[in-house]
């Protein structure tokens, strides 16, 4: 499989999300698959949940054990930084650390599978998001 191509040997342990997610949020697994959509299209969203060290309301999905106070301060500053050039530089700096530390292995990109039938029409959107307003009933 894909993971073997990068030297990672795994034994699949498929679980319902009600059993899988607590393993991540409670830090009880060393390796896991997690899909993460970014509705804001902003790196801050990813950093808040997946990179920032665990606190009561931030870093809640960081199952890596990674914790860096200096980086956490930069992540928090993104929410109020209005200097676009400085904010973009902070985002680039944070991504550099994330990549250098190899916090995540982006080996799998899951997309929606589209089912079609003659009775229902829908445009397949390039953003991979079905928009109900474009549904037609034939």
Spans of features found by a protein language model:
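Periplasmic binding protein-like
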Residues: 2-55, 90-91
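Bilobed periplasmic-binding protein-like "clamshell/Venus-flytrap" ligand-binding domains
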Residues: 28, 32-36, 81-118
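Arginine residue identity/basic-tract feature
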Residues: 17, 54, 87, 96, ...
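Short, solvent-exposed loop/beta-turn-alpha elements that line the ligand-binding surface or hinge
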Residues: 23-28, 48-80, 109-138
């Amino acid at each position: 499989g894909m993971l073997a191509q990068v030297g990672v040997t795994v034994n699949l342990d498929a679980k319902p999300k009600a059993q899988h997610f607590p393993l991540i949020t409670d830090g009880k697994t060393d390796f896991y698959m997690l899909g993460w959509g970014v509705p804001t299209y902003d790196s801050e969203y990813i950093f808040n949940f997946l990179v920032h060290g665990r606190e009561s309301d931030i870093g809640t999905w960081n199952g890596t054990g990674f914790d860096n106070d200096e980086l956490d301060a930069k992540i928090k500053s993104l929410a109020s930084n209005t200097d676009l050039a400085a904010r973009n530089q902070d985002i680039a700096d944070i991504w550099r650390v994330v990549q250098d530390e190899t916090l995540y292995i982006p080996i799998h990109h899951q997309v929606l599978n589209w089912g079609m039938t003659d009775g229902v029409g829908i445009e397949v959107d390039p953003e991979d998001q079905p928009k109900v307003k474009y549904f037609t009933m034939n």
